[in-house]
Amino acid sequence: MAVFTQVTHDQAQSLLDHLQLGQLTELKGIQGGIENTNYFLTSSEGEFVLTLFERLSAQELPFYLHLMRHLAVRAIPVPKPMENDAGQILFEVAGKPAALVNRLKGASELQPTAQHCQIVGDMLARMHLAARDFELSQPNLRGLNWWIQTVPQILEFLTPECSQLLLQELAFQVDLSAQPVFKSLPKGAVHADLFRDNVMFDEDHLSGFFDFYFAGVDTWLFDLSVCLNDWCIDLKTGSFDSQRLHAFIKAYQRVRPLSASERELINPMLRAAALRFWISRLWDLHLPREANLLKAHDPQHFERVLKARIFHPIHIEHILGY
């Protein structure tokens, strides 16, 4: 989260008036993240998060907002978009598309244990199942097509060694995407960015998943792989912590058992998930936008993760006891 667009007191109060949500008492920019403008907004009626969308268009946004509402109605703990009397959930603030959602209680667990991983794995599977009947469809906008378009823009900033690894892995993923086994992977609406800092815990209770603005229709295995590459690793090396890895996968498996094709492709998809975030971090670092409070993430982290996934594949059959 970051602040690209300044929001005034009067602009925030105007939105609150429109939604009949009381008087503004505090408006505070949120540091962290790299896509949208975010504020903590407190009124006499409660605590909220105001998001102004800097890259997504008003045509793309209904998918994300209605997905959150769909999940919230089905008892998945996610922020619920506030709506006006006409049921509208997308508004305009400071000339940008905007939404207001309830603020989740608690804090992110940045040093998760196996127990945290078990809880998140369980809820991730429940979220995937809850979204099966979600009627809107939009591709993952940071998927393979975006990788193909973006890599040529960042190669000039890289060492020959990094360029070689990036191009080799991209070619591997392009080839994989054409395989029948890949095309057989189950799909649905996924979060696609469920890192540690996008989950809230209130003590040891999971209070919610948030920041759905990279969501899209993709394979459930990709979504699981994104999570495993963050929740279950040593952040210094990118290597898996076996206790957390086993806890996450087994919890997910108990709710939604992995198919044969998913078990076959879990290692290539772990590589895909690492590649996706290596590319986006390189892009954000070398082709940045101006913003208050913006902090670019270190792309070398996901270079290390990708290398760890390539050279140290996991043994899913052993983890699942097959």
Placement of each model-derived feature along the sequence:
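Conserved NTP-binding catalytic cores of kinases and kinase-like/nucleotidyltransferase enzymes
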Residues: 1-85, 202-205, 318-322
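ATP-binding pocket architecture of kinase catalytic cores
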Residues: 43-136
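Active-site acidic catalytic loop and adjacent metal/ATP-binding pocket
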Residues: 31, 36-44, 49-50, 81-82, ...
